[in-house]
């Protein structure tokens, strides 16, 4: 996260809601920079960021319980506009002199709001007497308002569903405007930001790019940077941004573990060397990785072997270069947001990149993380700003351990080659059908099962290939893609005819939950 004040920003105080990140997404979509801070460090975050408005999140906690989370007093003493969502509304009311009780009539799911009076937050959106769908998820509810507040909208089970103190620019809602099930929610948040707080909404990837380049130059100076390039979108965008800032001071290392998709490593190397003039080392470590993985069937053991070998290989190559002062990483904002424990102290969970986890400490390097303020879709937008083609930016997610976790059971070179060919044919058919961009992720899985088949006049005993395709918004939940049978038949026929070693193809129709997207 940024360490300095950020003009025209919004501070989001997180009380532990599972959808707090959606609030940040809605603010960013309105063209405004924001940061999420846990309630325990909200005062420090307020002083550091110097925001122009504050949003208080929901929470699984109950405001009536002793020791439940509170917003720091400075937020209400500052004179800034405040928007309380669900628990945020309740704690705002309690802290300003109102009352909250445990609800006898809980509200979960779709509800309808009756607008009782006009409100500045409704400008161009809602009017008195209108009715609107919202999404509720609360047990407690406000029973008495603080001085200065008025009810502006109600629902059947929430007489204080939408309250406002227009003079102080305080607003509280019992529903969740940040979720898609509240159709006008994003517009309400936009009205709060633009109309109430007066923030322009001119934060863009172009402006972010310029600022990031300046910050990288100031941090790195004339020192050297190395970056682990995986071929994925995150590490690629980070590398291009660092390269724009410091040029030849950056060296990228692509450790090819032999577990990538067909022709993937060669394509990445060609693109970055030929089109972006990046100093890139392509390290062919396939024999090293596959040699240790052969016969290993436990998925967690596979991951640990791959992670350890990656660090060892990367470290060896970095030392051959004479080392570096900085390590570039494609860390994203969701990776660094602190998780909130509303029952105790802050529970900080910072995910390290699966490839370079322990490298900064081992090699005494400082991190350069130019994407750590961005969400995934913003990274893609920045990639376009930097000139990466849509065909690269829009690629489906690919796991760090690669094909190793799409080959359940023991791994062999032969199995990986069979899988690689089947996967390439499957993706080719998806692109030919114009379906690639409609699918979140699609891939082939080579099962550790052989079945009897007949090809020509001969009997075969070969592997089963499972095809997987899902639709999703964020990868947290997913549904299987509903192909027509003609497409599946065409893809299966090509795989069986063109890939020696497969004689049966099946399609995975499992959603997440209960299944996961990947098989291992």
Curated annotation (Swiss-Prot):
Q: Where, by residue number, does ATP bind?
A: 230-236
Q: Which Pfam families match?
A: GATase, GMP_synt_C, tRNA_Me_trans
Q: Check the record and name the CDD domains matching this protein.
A: GATase1_GMP_Synthase (cd01742), GMP_synthase_C (cd01997)
Instruction: Give, as in the UniProt entry, the pathway in which the protein acts.
Output: Purine metabolism; GMP biosynthesis; GMP from XMP (L-Gln route): step 1/1
Q: Which InterPro entries match?
A: Class_I_gatase-like, GATASE, GMP_synth_C, GMP_synth_GATase, GMP_synthase, GMPS_ATP_PPase_dom, Rossmann-like_a/b/a_fold
Q: What is its EC number?
A: 6.3.5.2
According to its UniProt record, which reaction does this protein catalyse? Answer: XMP + L-glutamine + ATP + H2O = GMP + L-glutamate + AMP + diphosphate + 2 H(+)
Give the molecular function GO annotations: ATP binding; GMP synthase activity
* Cellular component aspect of the GO annotation: cytosol
Question: Active-site positions, per UniProt?
Answer: 86 (nucleophile), 176, 178
Q: Which domain of life is it from?
A: Bacteria
Its top-level enzyme class, in one word, is: ligase
Q: Which HAMAP family match?
A: GMP_synthase
Q: How would you summarize the oligomeric state and partners of this protein?
A: Homodimer.
Q: What is this protein called?
A: GMP synthase [glutamine-hydrolyzing]
The organism is Rhizobium johnstonii (strain DSM 114642 / LMG 32736 / 3841) (Rhizobium leguminosarum bv. viciae)
Lineage summary: Bacteria, Pseudomonadati, Pseudomonadota, Alphaproteobacteria, Hyphomicrobiales
């Amino acid at each position: 996260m940024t360490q300095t004040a950020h003009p025209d920003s919004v501070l989001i105080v997180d009380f532990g809601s599972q959808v707090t990140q959606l609030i940040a997404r809605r603010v960013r979509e309105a063209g405004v920079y924001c940061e999420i801070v846990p309630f325990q460090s909200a005062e420090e975050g307020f002083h550091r960021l110097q925001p122009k408005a504050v949003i208080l999140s929901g929470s699984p906690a109950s405001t009536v319980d002793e020791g439940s989370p509170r917003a720091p007093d400075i937020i209400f003493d500052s004179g800034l506009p405040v928007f309380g969502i669900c628990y945020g509304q309740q704690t705002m009311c309690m802290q300003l002199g109102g009352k909250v009780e445990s609800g006898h009539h809980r509200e979960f799911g779709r509800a309808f709001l009756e607008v009782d009076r006009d409100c500045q937050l409704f400008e161009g959106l809602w009017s008195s007497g209108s009715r609107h769908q919202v999404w509720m998820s609360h047990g407690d509810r406000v029973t008495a308002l603080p001085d200065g507040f008025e009810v502006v909208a109600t629902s059947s089970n929430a007489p204080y569903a939408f309250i406002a103190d227009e003079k102080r620019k305080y607003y509280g809602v019992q529903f969740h405007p940040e979720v898609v099930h509240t159709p006008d929610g994003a517009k309400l948040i936009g009205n709060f930001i633009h109309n109430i707080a007066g923030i322009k909404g001119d934060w863009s990837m172009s402006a972010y790019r310029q600022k990031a380049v300046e910050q990288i130059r100031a941090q790195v100076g004339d020192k050297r940077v190395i970056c682990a390039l995986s071929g994925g979108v995150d590490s690629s965008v980070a590398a291009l941004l660092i390269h724009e800032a410091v040029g030849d001071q950056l060296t990228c290392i692509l450790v090819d573990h032999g577990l990538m998709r067909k022709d993937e490593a060669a394509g990445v190397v060609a693109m970055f060397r030929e089109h972006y003039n990046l100093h890139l080392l392509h390290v062919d470590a396939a024999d090293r990785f596959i040699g240790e993985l052969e016969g290993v069937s436990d998925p967690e053991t596979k991951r640990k072997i791959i992670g350890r070998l990656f660090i060892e290989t990367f470290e060896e190559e970095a030392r051959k270069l004479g080392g570096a002062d900085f390590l570039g990483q494609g860390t994203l904002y969701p990776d660094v947001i602190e998780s909130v424990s509303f029952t105790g102290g802050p529970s900080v969970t910072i995910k390290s990149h699966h490839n370079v986890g322990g490298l900064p400490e081992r090699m005494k390097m400082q991190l350069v993380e130019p994407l750590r303020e961005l969400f995934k879709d913003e990274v893609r937008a920045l990639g376009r700003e930097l000139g990466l083609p849509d065909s690269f930016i829009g690629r489906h997610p690919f796991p760090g351990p690669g094909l190793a976790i799409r080959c359940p059971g023991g791994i062999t070179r032969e199995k990986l080659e069979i899988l690689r060919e089947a996967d390439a044919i499957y993706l080719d058919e998806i692109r030919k059908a114009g379906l690639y961009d409609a699918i979140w992720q699609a891939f082939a899985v080579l099962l550790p099962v052989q079945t009897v088949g007949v090809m020509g006049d001969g009997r075969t005993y070969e592997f089963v290939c499972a095809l997987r395709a899902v639709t999703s918004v964020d990868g947290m939940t997913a549904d299987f893609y509903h192909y027509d049978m003609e497409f599946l038949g065409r893809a299966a026929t090509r795989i069986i005819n063109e890939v020696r070693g497969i004689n049966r193809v099946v399609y995975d129709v499992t959603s997440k939950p209960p299944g996961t997207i990947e098989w291992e």
